[in-house]
Structures are given as C-alpha cells and as structure tokens.
C-alpha cells in the first residue's frame, strides 16, 4: 500500500473484507494478438462471495454504517445484481440485517438464486431503473426508523463518495504491487464509482496513467455529470485536488444488459486463450472495448484491465450467450 494513500484513508472507518492483495497477471496470448502488453488486476478474486469490485467499496460503506450504529443495510439493483448480492452477504457476515430492493423478472438464476439460498431478504418492484428503486429504498428506511431501527441505505453499485474510497485504496495497492509503468488503466463503467476512485487515486499519486472507463449502460451527459460529482465529492472528503480526469468510451451496444455476438466471442476468446472468465454485462463489454481501442493505438503500449468480477451473471444470460456463439 502506497504510504500517501494509506495516510489519507486512515481516518475513514473500514472493515476488512479482502484478506489479500488481488494479483496482477500478464496476458501473453491476447497481448501478442493486439500488439500491446495487456495485464489484468484480478478483482474477481476479492474473496467474499462471488468476489468483484463491489467488495472494495463495501469495506468503506459498511465501515461507515457500523460507525453510525446501523443495524440494517438497504441497497438496490437489478434482480441479477452482483452488488446487491455481495452487499447482503457482507452485511450478514458483519451481523447486520439486509434488504435488497430489486427490479426485474424473478427467476431463480444467478445472483437472485444466491440471494435466496443465503436467506437475504429481497423486495422486487416494477421499476424502470435504479433511480426509481432508490425511492422505494428510502421509503423502507423511513418505515424502519419509525420501528426504532437504524437503516443505512447504499446507492446503486455502491457509487457514493464513501464507496469511491475503495478504489482510491486499490490505486495505492497497484502502485506498490507492480513495477510495470502502465499507460492506461481500463475498467467497466456502470454506476461510475470504480472509475471515480481510480481517477482520484491516480491524481493523489500524480501518476501519468490514463483512467479509461468503458460505459456498459446509460451513456451521455447524465453519466459524465454523475462521474464528475463523485470525483469532486470524494476529493472533498479526502481534502485533495483532482488533477486526473477519466476518459469514457461507449461500448454498451445501446443499453445495459444487451448481449451481442461481439461480447460473446470476446468472453470465449479470453477464456480459451488466457483461462480467465469474463461476464456478459460488465467485463465482457469492457474487454471488447479495450481490444478495439488498443488495436487503434489509443491506450498506449502497456494496459492494465481491472477485472471487476460478475461471473454469476453469466448464468443469468446463458441461453442468450449460447445462441450468439
């Protein structure tokens, strides 16, 4: 852990959910194919439940919840949400109750199946997006307060200034873990918290590394504004200035959760060439974007990809994926 980042983060409550540094691997076969050195930070191996990037955010979010005396955690997401499942699981591990406020078709597959197996309370609504779900979450929180409970509401994907600190910490880990001088760090951008944290961490260390986000869903002014606000608010928490701005590229194929032949093929290629499994919603799209941009020479010679996890999402989209291969 880089001492500068360690010192900045020391004042924030944190629960340790990740007992190790996640490894950085070189991808020799993919690198030869695209003409750039590609490395992967295995944040799919963060250790709790199905792993993934959300665990880093939850270390600070649940640390904050416990410091405020919370006894129940509420969060939102799609029925197959990685974030919702690992939030519920982490809360239970820490002795907290959890309520997952979800939208979508109730099928016993993927993360929704895991929610049920683990006995995590779920409430499914006919909502158009996570913003609408947050209204339901706040209503539930108010109801619990009237009952004398102490709820703590976590936004979609854990994308909040506190959650962003998890990937500021990740930059500190990368800085002392690898001797490679990366030109760019590439990550899937959904709710934006991971990309915001990477950008802020690179600013703090004054690293000449480009943070690159591959948008996997809603793209445009709303997303860029949200990302800017996350970075600004997290920087204010830490008392630092922002020097590095992220770059965003749209590889959503039109909408969140839309699976295409390109995504299916890149999942198969990375799996069979490197032995690493990507998911169709986040990392599959993001890695496809990486390959496309790298072939155009837009990411430099040495690229680090953050594997944000999400393997269980593959099973939710199984029939669709197979039909495209």
UniProtKB/Swiss-Prot annotation:
UniProt KW Hydrolase keyword: yes
GO molecular function per UniProt: 1-aminocyclopropane-1-carboxylate deaminase activity; D-cysteine desulfhydrase activity
Highest taxon in the source lineage: Archaea
Entry keyword set: Hydrolase, Pyridoxal phosphate
Reactions catalysed according to its record: 1-aminocyclopropane-1-carboxylate + H2O = 2-oxobutanoate + NH4(+)
Pfam families named among the record's database cross-references: PALP
Documented EC number(s): 3.5.99.7
Cofactor(s) annotated in UniProt: pyridoxal 5'-phosphate
Modified residues (N6-(pyridoxal phosphate)lysine): 54
Signal sequence range: none
PANTHER family: 1-AMINOCYCLOPROPANE-1-CARBOXYLATE DEAMINASE-RELATED
Family (UniProt): Belongs to the ACC deaminase/D-cysteine desulfhydrase family.
Protein name listed in UniProt: Putative 1-aminocyclopropane-1-carboxylate deaminase
Originating species: Pyrococcus horikoshii (strain ATCC 700860 / DSM 12428 / JCM 9974 / NBRC 100139 / OT-3)
